[in-house]
Swiss-Prot record:
This is Hemin import ATP-binding protein HmuV. It comes from Photobacterium damsela subsp. piscicida (Pasteurella piscicida). ATP binds at residues 45-52. Part of the ABC transporter complex HmuTUV involved in hemin import. Responsible for energy coupling to the transport system. The complex is composed of two ATP-binding proteins (HmuV), two transmembrane proteins (HmuU) and a solute-binding protein (HmuT). InterPro entries: AAA+_ATPase (IPR003593), ABC_transporter-like_ATP-bd (IPR003439), P-loop_NTPase (IPR027417).
Length: 265
């Protein structure tokens, strides 16, 4: 994607009055939010708070009962699916794939919306596998990979998909660190951070408050389908706010070198 400053601080995604009810349970209760380019926005909250439901509504996987979504100032319904695929990439928490593709073939699937040659797709996917750190797995059968390895291969696929997004880029990550070890958690979030610094709008569903505080520019805490807090890490992660939402007392201190909040439970 392009790294021009004009893509920063643009409203990439706007949601108005989103309401979602499934099986008689309200999952989203009239949610309003704007997601801006050039930022990482982390969606936080306890289990069942509505985080993944919100992400799935924003990316079109689930249709809300009511409400509207705009992507770069145009109604989402006005975006042809093949065009939207070039500008919005989604890494789900769990990716099911029943065919015995090689890992590099999975990464190359990201090039399908790009209308490029097979050779170009292979080069692009190989580049992103190196970036994610899975190039050594390129010729492994995908089903033989560990959960974390599969997740990283799919991240390479999503990066390949967004490689021609230009200034309009939205990256959605649903629990991207859940199956990863410490080093790969930070490496994944560093890649997301670099994309946001180039102008991408990055939305991450994450449970780890400390990782969110370290990497996100903006935190949104959801609870019972409603936004309970929205702001910078220091504005949102107060002891009172965290205890009220999660039901557990915490202390909040400043990181000794980088001054982001650190949660001690």
């Amino acid at each position: 994607m392009s790294s021009t400053l004009s893509s920063h601080n643009v409203i990439a995604l706007k949601a108005s009055n989103l309401h979602l009810q499934l099986g008689g349970k309200t999952l989203l209760d009239n949610v309003d939010l704007e997601i801006r380019s050039g930022q990482i926005t982390a969606l936080l909250g306890p289990n069942g708070a509505g985080k993944s439901s919100l992400l799935k509504v924003l990316n079109g996987e689930i249709t809300p009962n009511s409400g509207s979504i705009e992507i770069f100032s145009s109604p989402k319904d006005h975006w042809p699916s093949e065009l939207l695929a070039k500008h919005m990439g989604i890494l789900p928490q769990h990716s099911t794939l029943s065919f015995s593709f090689l890992a590099h073939e999975v990464a190359e699937l990201g090039a399908m919306p790009l209308a490029i040659s097979n050779h170009q797709a292979q080069q692009l996917a190989a580049k992103n596998m190196v970036k994610v750190g899975v190039d050594h797995l390129a010729n492994r059968l995908y089903p033989t990979l560990s959960g974390g390895e599969k997740q990283r291969v799919h991240f390479a696929r999503v990066l390949t998909q967004l490689s021609h997004s230009g200034e309009q880029c939205i990256l959605m990550l649903d629990e991207p660190t859940s199956a990863l070890d410490l080093a790969h958690q930070h490496h994944t979030l560093e890649i997301a951070q670099a994309l946001s610094q180039q102008g991408a709008a990055v939305i991450i569903v994450i449970h780890d408050l400390n990782l969110a505080a370290q990497y996100a520019d903006r935190l949104i805490i959801l609870n019972q389908g409603k936004i309970q807090a929205d702001g910078t890490p220091w504005q949102v992660l107060t002891p009172t706010a965290v205890e009220n939402v999660y039901g557990w007392p915490v202390q909040v201190i400043a990181h000794p070198e980088h001054n982001y909040p650190v949660i001690l439970a």
